[in-house]
Amino acid sequence: MGSGSQSLRKKLLLAVAAPIVFFIAIEGSLRLFSYGNPSTFTLRKTYSGQDYHVANPNFTARFFPKQNPRSPVPFAIPVKKPANGLRVLVLGASAAQGDPKPSFGFSRMLERMLSGQFPERSVEVFNLGITAINSHVVKDIASDCRKLEADYWVVYLGNNEVIGPFGPANPSQSTRGNLLKIRNSLLQSRTGQLLTDLLSVNKKQPLQWKGMEDYLQPIQWDSPELMKVHADFRANLESIVKSGKKSGTEVLLSTVAVNLRTCSPLLPEGPAQNSWKARDFAKARDLDAYRFRADSRTNEIIREVASNDGLRLIDSARRFAMLEPEASEPLFLDHVHFTLAGNSLIASLIVENILDQQERNPRPPSKNPTLGFTRFDRHGVLKIMQGRLSRAPFLKQSTNGLSAKRLQPMIERLAPNSTEVLEAIDQKYLEAIEAHPQDPFIRNNYITFLLYHNLTVEARPHCQKALELAPWDPKTHYHMGLVLAGSQNPTNACRHLQDAIVIEPGHHLSHSLLGSLLMDGDPESALEHLYAALRIEPDDVRTLLALANLRLAANKLDLRDHKEAYSLALQACAKTKFTNPNALVLFAEATKHSNRRKETRAKLEDAIRATEDPKTKAMLQETLENL
């Protein structure tokens, strides 16, 4: 009896131990041969002899399709914290990141403001926000941030709970939540990554990510799905707070301010629209079944968690609601993202909280707080927002909601239209650089301005300086690649673009430019990079045209595809409303090769009728006559 029982125990032990030993052996072998990628949020890198924590470019592969990675604003956190350092980490999604221009987000303003309030400290504010993530992702980020020796975590989170990873409105994940969580856990190991790669199908098939259009799944206010979302959010937020406390960090939770007054329901049907008409804006937001904004219950949970854990609360939602009606300028660009004034308000609320916690009286504002925000930057922000507001989910809003058309007069007014205006913008950038010479963000914005106006010679020394200041930023390598692409040194241009892609695999501009540079010498690689760029940013006209050109006239016949070239050229024309001469030339050429003159004539005739601009009309008419 005893020996039989002992034998059974041995068999059970072997049954349990064998797979574990096998897994450890496989995992060890894969790591030994450098298969797969680390799953942590940060990696350790050395630049100029100093060790830093930098973003892991593969971190979000557990939460998003591999072809559409998400990345934070590039950062490099010194492993050795300054003795007099005041280190702040900002955690959250796109609103926390400062989208659409993180260089003017509240993290940047917070750093300037804190530097003015604590002149005796070495102030560091690191923006760890990532577009499209939610608390399921931030929970893992927070766990990894425990080693970063921060004094404060600012957690601004809650807009993407329904649409982000594991959310019920996420089309790729909502019906498979538990399976995806298991997959997510497996992907933290190299063995799990190997299994995923082996089981993946159509890995090279282009994926068209459309942004917010992908998440138009109505979720009702009283639905079981939303109740689960709120329960998950509470659990994740408590986990984030626990990670912060374990690291000895002061965690500052903020409620989430959203646009209530000028963002009508995104799905304007039934009770939501009735509440909007009755000017009960908060209720209209809660009843809006397209859940792209944090609702009132989400903010209640944030307040409750802060209270239960004895944390200091930044009640941004209430402060915005109080101040917005009297604000001298808009606080929101769209449904949740801030204007410069909105970002400034959030930053000031955080500073107010930190000063209160440290029992310090506020000092007068710094004399040089500038971030170098110019007319050129404002124009660029409005152009981005016009593009976004022209697409779902904003298309169904009532006429008094957000509107792309309303931005057009401002965009036209801000467009640099004279030498004097350009010189004034240039001077403002140079003054900002002089005030903050070690700031890579200002310098990169200035480089963007110079390259936009084809001033590559003037841009090159600033590109070199930006590379010295922030070699971990893919934008610095992309800018240098762009400058060198127009010179006699395409090899070095390609090297910088490849460096940018290593740092951030989702840097679509580098993929697009590299694809264009490789079209003659290595068309197969060119095709791969152009498809990668298009998967990440399907509306990029330059990529559409480059890919159409390659498919139309590749020096290898097997890479030619006239049907696809026609489709790509047509997309480029449609995106530019048939006003881009290069797109029209390529469209006409693709028409001839694909024998689709009748279809093209109809498209051009429609465009002629739609435009009121005489020059555009003449250009379209000439294209039509030359078919």
Tell me what each language-model feature is:
Residues 14, 228-233, 331-362:
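Histidine-centered active-site loop/cap adjacent to the catalytic His
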